Amino acid sequence: MAAGERSWCLCKLLRFFYSLFFPGLIVCGTLCVCLVIVLWGIRLLLQRKKKLVSTSKNGKNQMVIAFFHPYCNAGGGGERVLWCALRALQKKYPEAVYVVYTGDVNVNGQQILEGAFRRFNIRLIHPVQFVFLRKRYLVEDSLYPHFTLLGQSLGSIFLGWEALMQCVPDVYIDSMGYAFTLPLFKYIGGCQVGSYVHYPTISTDMLSVVKNQNIGFNNAAFITRNPFLSKVKLIYYYLFAFIYGLVGSCSDVVMVNSSWTLNHILSLWKVGNCTNIVYPPCDVQTFLDIPLHEKKMTPGHLLVSVGQFRPEKNHPLQIRAFAKLLNKKMVESPPSLKLVLIGGCRNKDDELRVNQLRRLSEDLGVQEYVEFKINIPFDELKNYLSEATIGLHTMWNEHFGIGVVECMAAGTIILAHNSGGPKLDIVVPHEGDITGFLAESEEDYAETIAHILSMSAEKRLQIRKSARASVSRFSDQEFEVTFLSSVEKLFK
């Protein structure tokens, strides 16, 4: 009897859920239709707003070209791409209106342009309008101690919405890697959309790190020690990679900065028909003006690192390798070496990172041999590179490495990480001659630095000449040609 009652209750429960199926389907369908109508209405309003923005004082329609670059005042390689891209477009389309969406609310537009000239020696030929975004904190990694990739990506949608509400462009280019803004501007804003990818938000290498339970800056030790958490994170990464591929595929034009980035974007976005390698612009000519003499303006040897103070740049590896080298030199003879770390700080997190690096050099007892130069002018950067014997780079899987190219053009012997863009595109033989060195571990770096310093001046000069000859393919002029060719589709 009890079994019969349970069976009857189960049937009754199933009938109840079945009775809700069709009403639920109707409700869901109605909500979807309402959502589509609302979004379509917003799109129509934005199209009307776009016409008002693009109409000039003389009544003619002007094309509005916008770049999404929330950290345009940061002073890194990505910002150099932004200013060179703007300059190239202004030369070809002088009648267009140019807009930059930025979150640098602590400065004005003129200060941003002056900073671009001071750091990169770039001056635009036509005015640029800056749209200042108040919600940039939504893409700060410090806001998301867990699920950082997802948090920042969702935050970028809200930041993109703020940008779209203030200015609706005809052509939208994401120049900083916020792929989740692409469908927003394409389907809601009705824009032609393009993207310049410096570094994929997620890569197959990151998946491998989690899968193999290796410790990394994106994989905490407590996760690697727990098989269950590793599995959960791996599922999260695979789901995120799938969504990242969907939003990225919305782009009409995709530009990537290296062979390494190309391989990852092709596997994730699957838009090979509209994807091209556009090497980032490096001001090689300015550095090529530095005479190729053996650096004897200062006693001893100067080692220089150029790169923003971000965690993935792995500056601690440079300091530890340098300390290991100094310890060996102190045994042999008094050291005459100095390490100068040059880079930009975007925010308080970067400033805190610099302070941690200072403490690390103190803990290792090498503080008097290590200097930090933050947000320095371009002329000062050039002066340091002209004096340096070795240029250091330690980022694992660096997407490209503008700092690496600048060091080579300036005549330093480059010692870069044996991965990513430096390995595949930059520190490669030129006409059969070596152009620099690659390393991975702390010991590798220390030993290779010692090897470079032990070389004769003539041998170093030969490597420096080969390196200089190889970097012409990364010039501003080459960038302009390939960039304009790639984005041409957006203007048809």
From Swiss-Prot:
Assigned GO CC terms: endoplasmic reticulum membrane; membrane
UniProt xrefs under Pfam families: ALG11_N, Glycos_transf_1
Keyword Ribosomal protein: no
TM region positions: 20-40
Start-end of intramembrane regions: 234-254, 400-420
Membrane topology qualifier: Single-pass membrane protein
Residues exposed to the Lumenal side: 1-19
Outcome recorded upon mutating Q318P: In CDG1P; no effect on protein expression
UniProt keyword terms in alphabetical order: Congenital disorder of glycosylation, Disease variant, Endoplasmic reticulum, Glycosyltransferase, Membrane, Transferase, Transmembrane, Transmembrane helix
Keyword Lipid biosynthesis: no
Pathway terms, separated by semicolons: Protein modification; protein glycosylation
Domain of life: Eukaryota
Cytoplasmic side: 41-233, 255-399, 421-492
UniProt cross-references to InterPro entries, sorted A to Z: ALG11 (IPR038013), ALG11_N (IPR031814), Glyco_trans_1 (IPR001296)
Consequence of substituting L86S: In CDG1P; no effect on protein expression; no effect on localization to endoplasmic reticulum membrane; decreased GDP-Man:Man3GlcNAc2-PP-Dol alpha-1,2-mannosyltransferase activity
One GO MF term attached to the UniProt entry: alpha-1,2-mannosyltransferase activity
Consequence of changing L381S: In CDG1P; no effect on protein expression
E.C. numbers: 2.4.1.131
Catalytic activity: an alpha-D-Man-(1->3)-[alpha-D-Man-(1->6)]-beta-D-Man-(1->4)-beta-D-GlcNAc-(1->4)-alpha-D-GlcNAc-diphospho-di-trans,poly-cis-dolichol + 2 GDP-alpha-D-mannose = an alpha-D-Man-(1->2)-alpha-D-Man-(1->2)-alpha-D-Man-(1->3)-[alpha-D-Man-(1->6)]-beta-D-Man-(1->4)-beta-D-GlcNAc-(1->4)-alpha-D-GlcNAc-diphospho-di-trans,poly-cis-dolichol + 2 GDP + 2 H(+)
Disorder cited: Congenital disorder of glycosylation 1P: A form of congenital disorder of glycosylation, a multisystem disorder caused by a defect in glycoprotein biosynthesis and characterized by under-glycosylated serum glycoproteins. Congenital disorders of glycosylation result in a wide variety of clinical features, such as defects in the nervous system development, psychomotor retardation, dysmorphic features, hypotonia, coagulation disorders, and immunodeficiency.
UniProt family annotation: Belongs to the glycosyltransferase group 1 family. Glycosyltransferase 4 subfamily.
Job of this protein: GDP-Man:Man(3)GlcNAc(2)-PP-Dol alpha-1,2-mannosyltransferase that operates in the biosynthetic pathway of dolichol-linked oligosaccharides, the glycan precursors employed in protein asparagine (N)-glycosylation. The assembly of dolichol-linked oligosaccharides begins on the cytosolic side of the endoplasmic reticulum membrane and finishes in its lumen. The sequential addition of sugars to dolichol pyrophosphate produces dolichol-linked oligosaccharides containing fourteen sugars, including two GlcNAcs, nine mannoses and three glucoses.
Protein name: GDP-Man:Man(3)GlcNAc(2)-PP-Dol alpha-1,2-mannosyltransferase
Organism: Homo sapiens (Human)
Name of the coding gene: ALG11
